[in-house]
């Protein structure tokens, strides 16, 4: 995952910042508690593809 991409992309729901979870290959939006998957290194920024996460998962 190119960390420069994190400076450009924003959460499609709240326009907030993402945090990269390398272990799960996901972009995490702490504001909405949503995790967006990466497919071959490309973020899938569709709300319908995001999974809800628990608050303790946002610390990853």
From Swiss-Prot:
Q: Name one Pfam family in it.
A: Trm112p
**Cross-referenced SUPFAM superfamilies:** Trm112p-like
Signal peptide positions (record): none
Question: What InterPro entries does this protein map onto?
Answer: Trm112-like
- Taxonomically, the superkingdom here is Bacteria
One GO location term (cellular component): cytosol
Entry's family note: Belongs to the UPF0434 family.
The name under which this protein is listed is UPF0434 protein SG0997
Gene source species: Sodalis glossinidius (strain morsitans)
């Amino acid at each position: 995952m190119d960390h420069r991409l994190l400076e450009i992309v924003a959460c499609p729901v709240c326009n907030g910042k993402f945090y990269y979870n390398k272990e799960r290959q996901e972009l995490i939006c702490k504001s909405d508690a949503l995790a967006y998957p990466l497919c071959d290194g490309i973020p899938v920024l569709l709300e319908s593809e995001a999974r809800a996460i628990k608050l303790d998962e946002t610390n990853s």
